[in-house]
Amino acid sequence: LKMLTRNMATEWAKHNVQVNGIGPGYFATSQTEPIRVDGHPFNDFIIQRTPAGKWGDPDDLKGAAIFLASKASDFVTGQVLYVDGGILATIGKPANE
């Protein structure tokens, strides 16, 4: 997503088109419901690893979408706005840190 966004932003900027992306983390949806139970290894991993300590709610994406669609982002292009509760900040760290 990051490289595609950057490449497209570079190519389309001359046409006054901004290209940005939203990088979602792990969200509570009907598809993730079967694994969002206490004791499920992946659920426990997400809860432990995400600094926010929870799965995201789909409504958490609204702010990012509104910002990128607004005049406030007129000079923003080639960026991915990660809405992930901070999980990317933990990549490469031991799980107990």
Q: Model-flagged regions — what are they?
A:
Residues D38, G53, S70-S73, G92:
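Generic structural signal for alpha-helix termini and adjacent loop/cap motifs
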Residues T10-K14, D74:
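Alpha-helical segment proximal to the catalytic Tyr-Lys
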Residues T5-R6, K62-A65, A69, D74-L88:
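Short-chain dehydrogenase/reductase
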Residues T50-L61, A72:
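A conserved structural motif in NAD(P)-dependent oxidoreductases
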Residues Y26-R49, T90-E97:
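A glycine/serine/threonine-rich, flexible loop-to-helix segment
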Residues H15, N20, Q79:
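Rossmann-like NAD(H)/NADP(H) cofactor-binding core
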Residues L1-T5, V19:
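Conserved catalytic Lys-bearing alpha helix of Rossmann-like short-chain dehydrogenase/reductases
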